[in-house]
């Protein structure tokens, strides 16, 4: 017969690493084609002119220029690039 009780284990001691989401290039910053502007889950910010959107909703630059953020309508925000002349 055992004289010591078995050790219990905790259940809630797991945590995942942060996903490094957010704005990577802010308004007024200069970008080149392929630069990631925003990493996001879902379309929190929508793509505008001269930007593309990846399958994970990452917004990236299609042309060289300056990043601008603006409102599409009351609810939706949009990011575009003003091409470098």
From Swiss-Prot:
GO biological process terms held by the UniProt record: translation
Presence of the UniProt keyword Ribonucleoprotein in the record: yes
GO molecular function per UniProt: structural constituent of ribosome
Entry keywords, A to Z: Ribonucleoprotein, Ribosomal protein
Gene3D superfamilies the UniProt entry points to: 2.40.50.100
InterPro entries recorded: Ribosomal_bL27, Ribosomal_bL27_CS
One matching Pfam family: Ribosomal_L27
Cellular component per GO, a single term: ribosome
Region (Disordered): 1-22
Family, per entry: Belongs to the bacterial ribosomal protein bL27 family.
HAMAP family, per the entry: Ribosomal_bL27
Name by which UniProt lists this protein: Large ribosomal subunit protein bL27
Organism: Sulfurimonas denitrificans (strain ATCC 33889 / DSM 1251)
Record gene name: rpmA
């Amino acid at each position: 017969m055992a004289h010591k009780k078995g050790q219990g284990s905790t259940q809630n001691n797991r945590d995942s690493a942060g996903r490094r989401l957010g704005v990577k290039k802010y308004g007024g910053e200069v970008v080149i084609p392929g630069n990631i502007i925003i990493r996001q889950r879902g379309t929190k910010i929508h793509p505008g002119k001269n930007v593309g959107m990846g399958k994970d909703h990452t917004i990236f630059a299609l042309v060289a220029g300056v990043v601008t953020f603006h409102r599409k309508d009351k609810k939706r925000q949009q990011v575009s690039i003003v091409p470098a002349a």
